[in-house]
Amino acid sequence: MKIRSLLANCYLYFLSAIAFFLQWVKPESKVTLLISFEANAKAILEEYEQGQYSYKLNILYTQQASAIAESFPNVDAYLLQEKNPIHLIKAVYLMFNSKVIITDNYFLLTSVLNKRKQTKCIQVWHANGSLKKFGLEDITNMQRTKTDIKRFQKVYSSYDYLTVGSEEMANIFKKSFGIKDNQLLKIGVPLTDPYYRENKKKISDTLNIQRKKIILYAPTFRDYNMQSIQLPFTEEQLIHQLKEEYVLFVKLHPAIQNNIDIKYSSDYIKDVSNYALFDLLMAADILITDYSSVPFEFSILNKPILFYTYDLKLYQQKRGLVDNYLSIIPGRACYDSESLINEIQTPFNYSKIKVFSDRWNKYSDGNSSQNLLNFIENLIS
């Protein structure tokens, strides 16, 4: 932990040095997307290409979000390898040359904007809800040094605005990032836009599973176990107890996707980690997750959600969950496969899903990207 902290601080000093030597750069009528996930960026870029906006939009993307550059060839896109000094210099230049930065994650890079009042930073975040504690609320902060916390705060203080889809998430951001009410843009979260449109993907045809229902298992990652995954069902259970009616799709979290080889390509269990989450959620009949943010967007579709919480106490202890987790989730917390199977075989209470979605997607109505780009238009005009 101490070595990582030292390296992070050295990285921060290097960024500060770059910012000092590039302080002469003047902002133009440009907006730069600084992204590590595809969902928000895709929704924003689709709206940008359809609309009439006075500013130019660029993309700074990490390897994890590289598909974005391929999907939008008409937009200038630059790969960001955060350990590459040349990439960092170029990134700071692009940011300083822009009037607005839109980001979707925690980047130390945005700390250079703290003394850059002519460039505004908008955090759209990569989730429209949260069941985990993060930021200043993260329980692992107890193991951090004061210097670490100060470094985190430098990043959080670089956010001029944050988009939110609900009062619940607004309150979480205020506690997690130490921000104020006047920084909150209650215009919805861009990544939710596609869920309000009819756009069902034929993944069932692609993977040759016609006539079977899809159970999508999309767990979050465990900091304390990045090398393995516990599946909710065996192939035998899918065949015998669930009567061959379902196929289990497994979507790994990006943080562990390259660490684990599920080695399943059977008729009943398939690794679909390389597919876009949106496409999988549209195709799924049932979602099984745990402490992930996936239910917040999936709930818009009003389809059954189950929670496989076999390590609830351990996760709470190691990572930390929001208060009243069990009363917030719109489905039963199941601690073993038998409980999950029983829930699947029992009629589902859809009213819980609607209440959950209405609560957490209050400001998301399918027009969040347009709302954001219009806000930026007014901001820089």
UniProtKB/Swiss-Prot annotation:
Gene3D superfamilies: 3.40.50.11820, 3.40.50.12580. GO terms for cellular component: plasma membrane. It comes from the Bacteria. GO terms for biological process: cell wall organization; teichoic acid biosynthetic process. GO terms for molecular function: CDP-glycerol glycerophosphotransferase activity. It holds the Pfam family Glyphos_transf. InterPro entries: Glycerophosphate_synth (IPR007554), TagF_C (IPR043148), TagF_N (IPR043149), Teichoic_Acid_Biosynth (IPR051612). Changing H126A: Looses 75% of activity. Pathway: Cell wall biogenesis; poly(glycerol phosphate) teichoic acid biosynthesis. Induction: Positively regulated by WalR. Mainly expressed during exponential growth and rapidly shut off as cells enter the stationary phase. Keywords: Cell membrane, Cell wall biogenesis/degradation, Membrane, Teichoic acid biosynthesis, Transferase. Coiled coil: none annotated. Its EC number is 2.7.8.44. It is found in: Cell membrane. Disulfide bonds: none annotated. It is a peripheral membrane protein. The keyword Iron-sulfur does not apply. It catalyses: N-acetyl-beta-D-mannosaminyl-(1->4)-N-acetyl-alpha-D-glucosaminyl di-trans,octa-cis-undecaprenyl diphosphate + CDP-glycerol = 4-O-[(2R)-glycerylphospho]-N-acetyl-beta-D-mannosaminyl-(1->4)-N-acetyl-alpha-D-glucosaminyl di-trans,octa-cis-undecaprenyl diphosphate + CMP + H(+). Belongs to the CDP-glycerol glycerophosphotransferase family. PANTHER family: TEICHOIC ACID GLYCEROL-PHOSPHATE PRIMASE (PTHR37316:SF1). Catalyzes the addition of a single glycerol phosphate residue to the prenoldiphosphate-linked disaccharide, as a primer for polymerisation by TagF. This is Teichoic acid glycerol-phosphate primase. The lineage of its organism: Bacteria, Bacillati, Bacillota, Bacilli, Bacillales.
